[in-house]
Design a protein with these regions (language model features):
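Residue-level detector of intrinsically disordered terminal segments
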Residues: 1-3, 19, 159
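Bacterial N-terminal signal peptides that target proteins for export
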Residues: 2-15
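C-terminal segment of classical bacterial N-terminal signal peptides
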Residues: 19-30
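Short, low-complexity N-terminal intrinsically disordered segments enriched in polar/charged residues
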Residues: 28-70, 183-198
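A beta-strand edge to alpha-helix "cap/lid" segment located at domain peripheries
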Residues: 32-40, 108-198
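Hydrophobic pocket/interface hotspot
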Residues: 48, 63-64, 72, 96, ...
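A solvent-exposed, acidic/Ser-Thr-rich amphipathic alpha-helical stretch
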Residues: 66, 70-125
Length: 198
């Protein structure tokens, strides 16, 4: 009983703070709430898709300024990996519209983009997930690789506030390899073996 009273009081406080009556909050039907949620999801997806459609070097800076919040976070490939950052300098966590545009501008100088295909799009409220695959050719070495990718984005008030891009970084880093190999031991039961041997 006490929980119900507290919940009603909290609901009344929220309603008053928003300038709404408790009756108007309780009059929202599940269908109306779903419709609002679906509209928000569609709007969030639209922002992310518009950004992805404008990632060419001549468009990405304007797209980032238009579609990215000033304090937005971009997580590229890993939260923080100094060794990977030596190979892929955009690796890590950065802030602001320039973080978004600089990633795509650098990618364009490292690889020729041969294919970028979105296979699935999911949106719920302000959250958006995009999945697909891409094929890139390294500019310096000429090696080609194909990788799956996954994007998690958050959109608030028509601007992205968070963007996380994941790919097969073993494949992307290997596209620059000129020589060398690793000796790897994955479990105690298995013997060591070499990878990257030509």
């Amino acid at each position: 009983m006490m929980m119900i009273a507290q919940t009603r009081s909290f609901g009344a406080a929220v309603a008053l703070a928003a300038g709404m009556s408790l009756a108007s909050i309780s009059s929202v039907t599940p269908a109306q709430a779903q419709s609002t949620s679906e509209a928000q999801a569609a709007a969030s997806l639209s922002v992310v898709m518009e950004f992805l459609s404008n990632t060419g070097p001549d468009k990405v800076e304007a797209a980032a300024e238009r579609l990215v919040a000033p304090d937005a976070t971009y997580v590229s490939l890993n939260f923080d990996n100094p060794e990977l950052k030596k190979i892929l300098p955009w690796t890590g966590t950065n802030k602001g519209p320039k973080a978004y545009s600089s990633v795509f501008m650098q990618v364009g100088s490292y690889w020729k983009i041969e294919d970028f295909t979105i296979t699935d799009k999911i949106a719920a409220g302000e959250d958006v997930a995009i999945f697909g695959k891409f094929t890139y050719r390294s500019v310096a070495v000429g090696d080609v690789f194909t990788s799956p990718f996954a994007i998690l984005a958050k959109v608030r008030d028509g601007k992205m506030t968070y963007f996380q891009f994941m790919e097969d970084t073993y494949a992307s880093s290997s596209s620059f390899r000129q020589s060398g190999s690793w000796t790897v031991k994955t479990t105690k039961a298995k013997p060591s073996f070499s990878v990257g041997v030509e």
